Amino acid sequence: MWAYESVFYQIYPLGFCGAPFENDGVLEHRINKVSEWIPHIKKLGANAIYFSPLFESDTHGYNTRDYCMLDKRLGTNEDFKNICQELHENGIKIVLDGVFNHVGRGFYQFQDVLKNRENSRYKDWFHISFEGNSNYNDGLWYEGWEGNYDLVKLNLGNEEVVQHILNAVKFWIDEFDIDGIRLDVAYCLSPEFLHRLRNYCDGLKNDFFLVGEMLHGDYNQRMNDSMLHSATNYECYKGLYSSFNSMNMFEICHSLNRQFGAENWTIYKGKHLFSFVDNHDVTRVASILSNENHLPLIYTLMFGMPGIPCVYYGSEWGEKADKSQGDQALRPSFEQPIENELFKHISKLADIKKNSTALNYGDFSTILLTNKQCVIKRCVDTETVLVCINEDENNYYANFNVSANYIDLLTNKELRVENGFEMKAYSSYILKLV
């Protein structure tokens, strides 16, 4: 599967392109901005893009009006088709956000229900009671997603609804030649629906990648051979920044050992979760870390641990934003990308990751662990890699039972390890056994 050897770049198109929050219905060809950023994305080393919602919606993209029309604030389907073609020509795969649990109030079929009530042929597309009322005083009650009544929950037990979604997926593949879908709130989608979606997609395109947004619980319930290929690793997202802020590397290593360790009981061994240090829903990593010296280190650990790394646009140069400022602060438009030292570091990590069988498929184990340091081992039969982190302000001699010659892939310098080695303050290493 191509995704297991990829580095993702996430773009939230409505924000990235500077579209107004409310859909004013005015056609603007803003999506073409993506084309201007392709050289930057390639230089970063990303070879796949995950686009947050970009189809016609009421406001933020997750309240869909039409699954088969690019949002007018972004342009036309032809615009996006050209963008997809250009991305593919540059060796970049494309994953779209599939928001299939709910739609917006502007969704045609829901508007028909509001107009025709019991006589609407779409009344069973949603969970509706004509004896109640809604927060919008519609004279009927409907189920909104987690109490958000601008997000109208679809009835995925209705065959017409499922067919409508599957037809949209086929349209995306036929029209834009996309390579995968990220399933919004996948934890709300029934296993039956995901099984149906997987079978359908497998029949449309080889190696079509499905990754689901999962927060808590056992990801295996929806990530398995008959449903999703991957799931968002929110457990390790929290563990990554918390381990640096609390100077407690035991937290992230506990999660990684629980998920991918050598013991037979580990829960995700051999699987490829979607790794990230921030995204469009959370505080940016440069803001949540209490020590800016830890910023390159957290990326080294994210790229070095098992999983598929994803970088959120703007964070590759250390852009800051706090969730308390509101969602729009997390999803801004930048005039130009910035290519600073952090960008160069992540670019090097991306190159290492894409070309390392051990980092893409290798076993995981911890060979040194203290509050402020860790050394993890990734290995396959043909390659052994050590990922080493020192989050302390002081140098540290990492003492572990290994004596061999390595090359530090971050610097391309050879290093002799004799029962360990000295790590510099605020440093990270990716050591490949020579």
Regions found by a protein language model. Give the residues of each.
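Active-site clefts of carbohydrate-active enzymes
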Residues: 267-290
